[in-house]
Amino acid sequence: MDKSINSMLSAIEIYNKPNFSYREETFAILAVNSWELLLKAFLLKKCSYKMDNLYIMESILKKNGEKSTRKKPKLNRAKNPMTIGIYEVIKKIEEKGTIISENLKNSIEALIELRDNAIHFHNEKEISKELQELG
């Protein structure tokens, strides 16, 4: 939860610096990170803090090469467990009985689109207006 709060505070602090270049993109990146951390913390609480609810699980291979029914966390390049994405987190939270408003989901989706464009290529139009509309 602390990381989520710190990420959002950083996003707001950077966004409020008028001469900070790339501030809208940085805001989108940090804001999405904040929402994802917050929602993952909420899901963990709903699941009695069982970490496997956040991990992408894969079957363990038997010695003969067949897949076992037992599963283990899939590891990333840094050998850390891979976690599910924000959309899967939202789905699991709702499956646990918590309703997330369509407005919130739409706002998060819009932030993700801005973040993805900032990270993977560029935003063709000014995103400051779109970010202000999300606020």
PLM feature spans:
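Short, solvent-exposed secondary-structure capping/transition elements
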Residues: L39-D52, H120, E124-L131
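Charged alpha-helical initiation segments
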Residues: M1-N33, F42-S48, D52-N53
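Flexible secondary-structure boundary motifs
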Residues: I56-N103, E113-L114
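Charge-enriched, short contiguous segments at helix-coil
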Residues: K96-G135
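Charge-rich, low-complexity amphipathic helices
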Residues: T26, N33, Y49, I56-N64, ...
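Short, charged/polar, low-complexity loop and linker segments
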Residues: I12-N16, V89-K96, D116-F121
